[in-house]
């Protein structure tokens, strides 16, 4: 994997090492990242943090570089480190986040998408909760924006999941169980703060994988598996904009776009492989993973029927079956 540093970290002493690393993958959302970066610059009373932007081979690379160059000056004026990394080709959201995690120097890290925003006190609220509780996962609430343009049942269901937080403390095995078996809170990685070494450990279980769908669930499965303490808080820390990113349900007119949808199957290939190699994992968790796999496959079939143009429905179905293999 090739990437280059386009913006060096601002000089700082050991004492100025950032406490939080904000990891931001970018692909095709250059037109929206300015609003996101403004929300970062507007953070109030935040701990020292760095922002790591990963250009995942975006078709708008030239525009993105120009925007980052402009914002670099503003970040430097605030003495906020800004790091810009690039993949030479599109590797998918999971791998773009991995690149950011590997570059992170903060004790904690957070994920964000460039078409969303942080609320003004998000980083302070999340960090304070981590520091006072000792939790290695802090989960805040998200507000879902854009529902007025997407009033359908699917959007409403997504909004409900995005706002789902277990308000309280979980420890040990209950962290994973409450998420994957009881569905007590969401697995979206945005709106959360993590111990950096915890996420790095989670990534060590995940082989290189092209994945742009369900990647949050894959990463969070292993993060929750290894976490010692989770705390959910009532504060809204994230503004999610529905129907602006890769997960939006739009008409699919080529096989490259359809491949991104099918990539959800990679998540379950990895999870099933892990479960096969670790027989001690509880039967309730195994069944929950199987149920999620069935649900994602069913959703892919629905997308095939609704979103894929008729001219290549047959090819798209063959691709879907090839990606899912024995899991269909």
What is each of the regions a protein language model found here?
Residues 37-86:
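Acidic donor-binding segment of Leloir-type glycosyltransferases
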Residues 117-231, 240-258:
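Donor-binding/catalytic cores of nucleotide-activated saccharide
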Residues 109:
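Short aromatic/hydrophobic "clamp" motif used to bind/position activated sugar donors
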Residues 1-42:
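N-proximal low-complexity "stem/linker" segments adjacent to membrane-targeting elements
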Residues 37-38, 65, 98, 106, ...:
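Short alpha-helix within the catalytic core of nucleotide-sugar-dependent glycosyltransferases
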Residues 84-104:
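Glycine-rich, basic loop-to-helix element that forms the pyrophosphate-binding segment
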Residues 19-21, 50, 218:
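Cell-envelope/extracellular polymer assembly enzymes that use nucleotide-activated donors
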Residues 2-17, 213, 232, 236-328:
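C-terminal subregions of glycosyltransferases and related glycan-biosynthesis enzymes
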């Amino acid at each position: 994997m090739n990437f280059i540093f386009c913006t060096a970290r601002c000089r700082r002493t050991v004492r100025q090492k950032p406490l939080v690393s904000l990891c931001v993958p970018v692909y095709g959302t250059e037109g929206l990242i300015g609003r996101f970066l403004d929300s970062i610059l507007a953070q109030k009373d935040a701990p020292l943090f760095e922002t790591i932007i990963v250009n995942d081979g975006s078709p708008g690379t030239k525009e993105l570089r120009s925007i980052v160059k402009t914002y670099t000056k503003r970040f430097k004026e605030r003495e906020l480190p800004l790091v810009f990394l690039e993949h030479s080709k599109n590797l998918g959201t999971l791998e773009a986040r991995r690149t950011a995690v590997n570059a992170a120097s903060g004790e904690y890290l957070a994920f964000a998408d460039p078409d969303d925003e942080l609320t003004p006190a998000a980083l302070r609220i999340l960090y304070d909760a981590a520091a006072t509780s000792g939790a290695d996962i802090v989960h805040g609430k998200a507000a879902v924006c854009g529902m007025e343009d997407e009033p359908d049942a699917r959007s409403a269901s997504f909004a409900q999941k995005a706002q789902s937080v277990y308000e309280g403390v979980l420890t040990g095995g209950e962290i994973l169980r409450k998420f994957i078996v009881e569905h007590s809170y969401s697995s979206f990685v945005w709106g959360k703060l993590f111990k950096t070494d915890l996420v790095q450990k989670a990534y060590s279980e995940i082989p290189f994988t092209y994945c742009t769908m369900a990647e949050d669930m894959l990463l969070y499965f292993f993060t929750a598996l290894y976490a010692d303490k989770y705390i959910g808080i009532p504060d809204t820390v994230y503004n999610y904009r529905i129907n602006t990113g890769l997960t939006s349900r739009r008409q699919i007119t080529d096989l490259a776009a359809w491949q991104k949808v099918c990539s959800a199957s990679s998540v379950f290939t990895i999870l099933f492989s892990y479960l096969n190699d670790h027989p001690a994992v509880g039967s309730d968790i195994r069944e929950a993973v199987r149920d999620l796999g069935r649900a994602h496959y069913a959703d892919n079939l629905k997308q095939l029927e609704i979103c894929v143009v008729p001219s290549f429905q047959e090819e798209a179905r063959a691709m879907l079956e090839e990606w899912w293999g024995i899991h269909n």
